[in-house]
Amino acid sequence: MKNNDSKISKYISLILRHKPEEIGLKLDEHGYLGVLDLIEGLNKSYEGFSMDDLERIVREDSKGRYSFNEDKSKIRANQGHSIKVDLGLEPIKPPKVLYHGTGRKYLESILKNGLIKKERNYVHLSKDIETASIVGKRHGDLVILEVDSESMFNDGIKFYLSKNNVWLCNYVPKKYIKELNLEEVF
C-alpha cells in the first residue's frame, strides 16, 4: 500500500473531517471512528488495507493530522472538521502573535470581514511564518497575515491548541489582522 499512502491519507482526512458517510459510518461526539470500521470501509476502495498501513500513515503524516485513542481502537482527525465534534480542547493563552497564510484573492474579503471559519469548526492559525506560508501557498499568490492574538485573548476571545499544534479560534475580527510585507519577511 505504501505507494498509495498519500492518496489514502487524503481519503482518510475526508472521512474523519467531513464525510464519514462516504464509507457508511458516523463519527462519535468526539470525532472518533472505530479503527476496524475504518479499515473495513477503506478496503472497499483499497483492497488489502491493514492496521499496519493505517499505523504507518498516521506515524508518517508530516502534518500530524490523526491520532489514535490509548488502545488504538479508535482514530480521529486532530482538527479541520466541517462536522460538529467536541475535541475536548481547553481554552489556552496564545502567543503574542499568530499567523494565517492565504491567497491574495481572499485578502479583500478578510480585511473587510475578518477571518471566518466558513465550513470548518474553527479558524486555523500558525505559530510561525514558515507554517503559515506552507498553508497559504496552497491558495495561490501567497499572503501572510499577522494576528494580534494577545489583544484578542485580552479582549475575551478564546483560543485552543490542537494536538498537532494548530492554533484554533472561532473568529478573528479585522481589527486584529495585519498583512505582512513578504519582502521584509523572506
Swiss-Prot record:
- Record organism: Clostridium perfringens (strain ATCC 13124 / DSM 756 / JCM 1290 / NCIMB 6125 / NCTC 8237 / Type A)
What is this protein identified as?
Probable RNA 2'-phosphotransferase
Q: Which InterPro entries does UniProt cross-reference here?
A: Ptrans_KptA/Tpt1 (IPR002745), RNA_2'-PTrans_C (IPR042081), RNA_2'-PTrans_KptA (IPR022928), RNA_2'-PTrans_N (IPR042080)
Q: Which HAMAP family match?
A: KptA
- Which EC class, in a word? transferase
Family assignment from sequence similarity: Belongs to the KptA/TPT1 family.
Query: Which EC number(s) does UniProt give?
Result: 2.7.1.-
Q: Which GO terms describe its biological process?
A: tRNA splicing, via endonucleolytic cleavage and ligation
- Quote one Gene Ontology molecular function term: NAD+ poly-ADP-ribosyltransferase activity
Does the UniProt entry include the keyword tRNA processing? no
**Function of the molecule:** Removes the 2'-phosphate from RNA via an intermediate in which the phosphate is ADP-ribosylated by NAD followed by a presumed transesterification to release the RNA and generate ADP-ribose 1''-2''-cyclic phosphate (APPR>P). May function as an ADP-ribosylase.
Q: Please provide an example of a Pfam family that matches this protein in its UniProt record.
A: PTS_2-RNA
